[in-house]
A protein has these predicted regions:
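Terminal RNA-binding accessory module
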Residues: 1-78, 374
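Rossmann-like S-adenosyl-L-methionine
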Residues: 2-13, 18-23, 238-474
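Short, acidic/hydrophobic/Gly-rich beta-strand patch recurrent on exposed beta strands
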Residues: 25-30, 161-165, 232, 361
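Extended interfacial segments that mediate partner engagement and assembly in macromolecular machines
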Residues: 63-73, 80-203
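Internal alpha/beta scaffold segment
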Residues: 170-213, 235-259
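Short edge beta-strands and adjacent turn/loop segments
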Residues: 210-224
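Short, aliphatic-rich beta-strand segments
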Residues: 219, 225-234, 292-296
Length: 474
């Protein structure tokens, strides 16, 4: 017999005091920290606990007694249900203030860093429609909101096109309007959905039972006006696939790259799948400071193009290049930073784990007639070794932009062996960055810190740190 779960208590008239990691807010009740999403400091609420541990608890707001004066009206109808844009209820100036504080807290608390200078965070000029890439999922298991459940109505159609509900791999929230990407994205998504619902033979995918035809939709935009659409199907049905793709091409002639994938795997990733061109090119072109970057369906490119430019300008400025330096660009991806700084460097060597990304990096150098870059593919800790440095020359500057987990200890040790004059550390996770900075502190001092907001209305923040080699005392 299953045991009944113990009902957790309701906490009444609790004041929210601060913002925490992962975008949640904090309340303190009897020396216990309570994490609550979708509330703002200054809100007075009733909290229904959903999880309780020894020193902390998690809960959700079930009633608002007072709304904080530091609260904004969310602009999206999906706020509070969708997993994105969780900070819409905070004014943007508050968002970037908390992100700035998050960077300081991580560097001082985790990294024990003494900072000479931390610059004001670079906010985003645009706080909506700033993404250049979105992926939507087709599902026959639509997530019903609390309001829909309360109506008691029966829904004949449970098909949805949108985003996965956090923690529910097979449930999808049906998105009416998303504020993250140019409105062409909304129009394409809704048109594809309507076509599939009104034409026979286009069942939405059932991820749990591995059934259905239409799986996912990717839309990529570029500042050049290029537009890529990729539709993913579970199996090949030439007649229906071509009918849908022809409809999309006819309705949206501005699409410059219309592609498709037949993905018969269990999961939705297409990194190991063939992406086939139905109409147009196999890529789009993005531009930055006169440079062109080829972006394919599998390419990594920063999803906020405007702020990516600001981020890379900071990295280049911190690098202090005069034209005589050997630069190593670690975790180079498609070589965006490497190519961006190449005109101010003598030579740039880029290293990246993904072979396809390195091929894109080489293409981007060729596209821009850049001849002073070299790119290598492989696991960073296996490529970047003392032998590699002895063979290719010691770098004057290392720029590193690792994944969220930060750098492997072997990579850090090799950097310490290389002893570049300057290290520019770009990070999407200031906590992991702080840990790495602590390890580098045996030979390097933090000189500048520049947070950059790439993702308005989320808790995520990018951070660029300049480290300089410590002078040896005689």
């Amino acid at each position: 017999m299953a045991r009944n779960k113990k009902q957790l208590p309701l906490l009444e008239k609790v004041t929210i005091t601060d913002v925490a990691a992962e975008g949640k807010a904090i309340a303190r009740v009897n020396d216990m920290v309570v994490f609550v999403p979708f509330v703002a400091p200054g809100d007075v609420i009733d909290i229904q606990l959903t999880r309780k541990k020894h020193s902390y608890a998690e809960g959700k707001a079930v009633f608002f007694h007072e709304y904080s004066p530091r609260r904004a009206e969310p602009f999206c109808e999906h706020f509070g249900v969708c997993g994105g844009c969780k900070w819409q209820h905070l004014p943007y100036e508050e968002q970037i203030r908390y992100k700035h504080k998050q960077v300081i807290d991580n560097l001082t608390r985790i990294g024990k860093i003494e900072m000479e200078e931390i610059l004001p965070i670079k906010g985003s000029k645009h706080t909506t429609f700033y993404r250049n890439k979105l992926e939507f999922t087709f599902s026959n298991k639509k997530w019903l909101t609390e309001e829909e459940v309360k109506t008691g109505a029966k829904f004949d159609c449970m098909d949805a096109v949108g985003f996965h509900i956090p923690g529910m791999f097979d449930k999808v929230l049906d998105i009416h309007k998303c504020w993250l990407q140019n409105d062409i994205s909304n129009r394409i998504r809704l048109a594809v959905k309507e076509y599939c619902l009104t034409h026979e033979g286009y069942p939405f995918f059932d991820l749990r039972n591995q059934e259905g035809f239409v799986r996912t939709l990717m839309i990529r935009t570029a500042s050049t006006g290029d537009l890529m659409v990729v539709l993913v199907f579970f199996y090949e049905d030439v007649e229906r696939r071509e009918a849908l793709l022809s409809y999309v091409a006819e309705q949206f002639p501005e699409i410059t790259s219309l592609m498709y994938v037949i993905n018969e795997k269990c999961n939705d990733t297409i990194t190991d799948q063939d992406v086939l061109v139905f109409r147009g090119k196999d890529h789009i072109i993005e531009e930055m400071e006169g440079l062109q970057f080829k972006v394919g369906p599998k390419s990594f490119y920063q999803t906020n193009s405007e702020q990516a430019y600001e981020l890379y300008k900071v990295a280049r400025e911190f690098a202090g290049l005069t034209g005589n330096e050997m630069v190593y660009d670690l975790y180079t991806g498609t070589g965006t930073i490497a190519n961006f700084v190449s005109r101010q460097a003598k030579k740039v060597i880029g290293i990246e784990y993904v072979p396809e990304a390195i091929e894109d990096a080489k293409v981007n150098s060729s596209l821009n007639k850049i001849e002073n870059t070299l790119f290598y593919a492989g696991d960073m800790k296996d490529i970047l070794t003392q032998d590699f440095i002895n063979q290719h020359g010691r770098p004057d500057v290392i720029i590193t932009d690792p994944p969220r987990a930060g750098m492997h200890d072997d990579v850090i040790n090799t950097i310490l062996f290389a002893e570049p004059e300057r290290i520019v550390y770009v990070s999407c996770n200031p906590a992991a960055q702080a840990r790495d900075l602590s390890l580098l502190s045996v030979k390097y001092a933090v000189k500048k810190v520049q947070p950059v907001d790439m993702f308005p209305h989320t808790h995520h923040v990018e951070n660029v740190v300049l480290l300089e080699k410590l002078k040896v005392k005689n």
